[in-house]
Amino acid sequence: MRGLEKQGSCATAAPCGCVQPALEAGNLLTEPIGYLESCFPAKIGTPRQPSICSHSRACLKIRKNIFNNPEHSLMGLEEFSHVWILFVFHKNGHLNYKAKVQPPRLNGAKTGVFSTRSPHRPNAIGLTLAKLEKVEGGAVYLSGVDMIDGTPVLDIKPYIADYDSPQNLSVHNDHHKLRAEAQVDGTANSCDQLLLSGRGKVQPRQSTKERPKCLEDRTSGENSQKSRDMSEIQHTLPEDRERALDLALEPSRGESMDMPENQLGPPELKSFLEEGTDRPRKVEGALVLPGSSAETQWDASYRARTADRVPYSVVPSWVTEAPVAPLQVRFTPHAEMDLRKLNSGDASQPSFKYFHSAEEAKRAIEAVLSADPRSVYRRKLCEDRLFFFTVDTAHVTCWFGDGFAEVVRIKLASESVQVADPEESLAALGS
C-alpha cells in the first residue's frame, strides 16, 4: 500500500496485474456512445476529409446502455448547425504506428505523424466536423462525413465559431478591450456599437471547400436602409470586421483600405472611416495632431496591445497547394444509365438508402473521385488498374487517366462484379 501511495498519480494495479482506469494518470477505458451508420461501407473510396463530399450521409444512434433516455442527452443539440465527432479508426488492421508517415496528399513525401490526420497514430482517434441535419429522438443525422459504416463514436461536441475559430477567438478576446478604448468623453463610439452588435452571428472563413453556414442569412432587400446597413455590419467576415475596429481606433494612419464600400455600413461609420489623415483626433479625451509625439506614442502602445492577435490560422503549403491536383470526373453513357436504374422509383428496382436522388449520388461520386482516393502505391504502380469502391448501394468501377477519372460501370452493391484479380487490368472491359 505504501508503495502505491508513493507512486502518486501512477496507475493502480488490479490483482490480475492489468492496469485499472485512472483519470489522473491518463489511463481510462473508453466506451462508444454509438456506432455510425454510414453511406461508406468500406475504407476504399471513403473521403479522407469531411469537406470533400458534402452529400455523404450518416446516422448515429446513442446506445441505451450509455443513457436510459438517449434523447435527453441530445436536448439542445438541434440548435447547432455543425458538430464535432470524436471516433476510433477501428479498421486500421494493425496497431503499429511510426513517427513519420506518408500521407496520400503528399504523394510519397514523409512528415511527422502529428502534423497529419493519419489514422495510424499512438491513439487511433479521429476528429470530424460534420453538418447536423436533424436530431430525431436518440438519433443524430449527419452529412459531410468521412467515416465508414460501423465506426465507434466516442463523443459529440457542438461546433461554436466563437470558440473553435482563431478568427472569431481574436475578436471575442479583444472586443471588450477595444470597446473601452474607443470610448470618447464617456460615451461609446457609435461605430463601435454597430460593429460589436454583430458579434456571434458570423461563422469563420474556412480554407476547405465546405464552410459552416451562418445560422442567419442576409436580410432581404425589402427591409429598411438602416436594417440593411446593420445586417451588412453583422455579417462582415471576422477579419474585415477586426480591420474596421482597428481603423476606428486609429483613423489617421495612412494605410490603404481595400474594404468594399458595401461593407462599410451606415453613413456615420462611413464618414468616420473616411476621415482624412491630416485631421486631428481624440485619444483618451485629448486632441492629438497628426505626426506629433503623442500620436507616435499612442500608435506604439496600440501595436503592443494588439501584437498577440491571431487574425487567421496558418497551415503549411502542402495543405493548400498539395502535389496531388484535383481530377476531372466523367461518366460513360452506360454508367449514367446504371445510376438512373438504381433510383428509378420502381418498387421492383433497388433504391438508395442515404442519397435522395440519382443526381445527388452522382455528385457524391464526383466529389470522391475528384480528390483521388487512391493510395500512393496505386497511383504510382497501378495506373492501368481498375478502381472499385462502394457508396450507399452503388458499387462503382472506374479508371484513372492523366488528370481525370472515368466511371465505366455502376452496379448494385449486392450484385457487384466479382473478378479473380482485385486489380483487374483495363483491358478486361475492352476499353
From Swiss-Prot:
Domain of life the protein comes from: Eukaryota
UniProt binding sites for S-adenosyl-L-methionine: P47, R48, Q49, H90, K91, R117, L127, I148, D149, G150, T151
Gene Ontology biological process terms, A to Z: tRNA methylation
Keywords recorded for this protein, A-Z: Methyltransferase, RNA-binding, S-adenosyl-L-methionine, Transferase, tRNA processing
Pfam families the UniProt entry points to: TrmO_N (PF01980)
Biased composition annotated in UniProt, kind: Basic and acidic residues: 207-242
Region spans: Disordered: 196-242
Keyword field contains Membrane: no
Family: Belongs to the tRNA methyltransferase O family.
Role played: S-adenosyl-L-methionine-dependent methyltransferase responsible for the addition of the methyl group in the formation of N6-methyl-N6-threonylcarbamoyladenosine at position 37 (m(6)t(6)A37) of the tRNA anticodon loop of tRNA(Ser)(GCU). The methyl group of m(6)t(6)A37 may improve the efficiency of the tRNA decoding ability. May bind to tRNA.
UniProt protein name: tRNA (adenine(37)-N6)-methyltransferase
Organism, scientific name: Mus musculus
